[in-house]
């Protein structure tokens, strides 16, 4: 190590990819109602971040919403933040297999974005400093290993359509931001969602309702972390 290199840990930043679109799976809606749902859900998510103290606990919070919810803007934001911070990423958007749904449902964040980030990370891991990814996107598990390949230490995802964005988000944020391990925060949020929705959903025959199965969150990673854990790095 040269005298000019610092051993101090980097501060932690949070990047939020926020785009609801106003879409509800399988339900056709008029445009005005989609716009209302889009605005309401996005403002609700930002309120939760303030309520549970994300802006106090993170050194920097960047929210990509509306026209900024695109692949190029997401990549640029992650790379810019990584210059000075280790980055946690919160995905509050819809998704398909291997894809995040961006601005107005017309911007898709998929192979092109991830391939570009992978090239940069493979050339110089220090340029993309991801720590944990938490997502509510449908088919999020299809992207979980991609995030690990980009250097993240833990990620989550649903195998299919995620029908339960709430209370999943609020329970996760409450646990994660008060210092619970990532895996515990994800597990508690998933259990809370299951308990709440099981009051309304009945599959019959002793089987789990397909929405419960589809929405189940899986955690993958190389280690568990808390909000205050310094990212472990290969020597």
Place the predicted regions along the sequence by residue.
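Short, surface-exposed linear patches
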Residues: 36-39, 87, 111-114, 155-159, ...
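Active-site-proximal C-terminal subdomain of hydrolase catalytic domains
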Residues: 131-235
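A domain-level signal for caspase-like cysteine endopeptidase catalytic cores
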Residues: 2-85
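Ordered hydrophobic segments in well-structured contexts
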Residues: 14-15, 60-63, 90, 210-212, ...
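Residues in intrinsically disordered, low-complexity segments of regulatory proteins
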Residues: 31, 38, 91, 195-196, ...
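Flexible, glycine-rich phosphate/dinucleotide-binding loops
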Residues: 22-23, 98, 141, 164
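Short, solvent-exposed loop/turn and secondary-structure capping segments
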Residues: 26-28, 100-104, 146
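Catalytic-core segments of thiol-dependent peptidases
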Residues: 49-142, 231
């Amino acid at each position: 190590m040269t005298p000019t290199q610092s051993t101090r840990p980097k501060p932690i930043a949070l990047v939020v990819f926020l785009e609801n679109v106003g879409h509800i799976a399988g339900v056709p809606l008029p445009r005005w109602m989609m716009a209302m749902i889009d605005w309401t859900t996005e403002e609700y998510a930002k309120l939760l971040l303030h309520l549970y103290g994300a802006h106090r606990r993170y050194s920097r919070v960047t929210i990509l919403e509306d026209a900024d919810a695109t692949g190029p803007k997401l990549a640029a934001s992650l790379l810019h933040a990584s210059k000075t911070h280790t980055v946690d990423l919160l995905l509050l958007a819809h998704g398909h297999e291997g894809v995040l749904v961006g601005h107005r449902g017309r911007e898709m964040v998929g192979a092109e974005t991830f391939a570009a980030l992978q090239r940069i990370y493979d050339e110089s891991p220090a340029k993309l400093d991801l720590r944990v990814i938490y997502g509510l996107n449908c088919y999020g598990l299809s992207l979980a290993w991609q995030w690990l390949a980009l250097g993240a230490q833990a990620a989550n995802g649903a195998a299919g359509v995620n029908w339960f964005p709430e209370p999943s988000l609020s329970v996760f944020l409450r646990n994660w931001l008060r210092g619970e391990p990532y895996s515990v925060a994800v597990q508690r949020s998933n259990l809370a969602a299951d308990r709440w929705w099981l009051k309304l959903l009945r599959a019959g025959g002793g089987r789990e309702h397909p929405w419960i199965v589809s929405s189940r969150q899986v955690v993958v990673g190389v280690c568990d972390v808390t909000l205050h854990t310094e990212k472990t790095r290969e020597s």
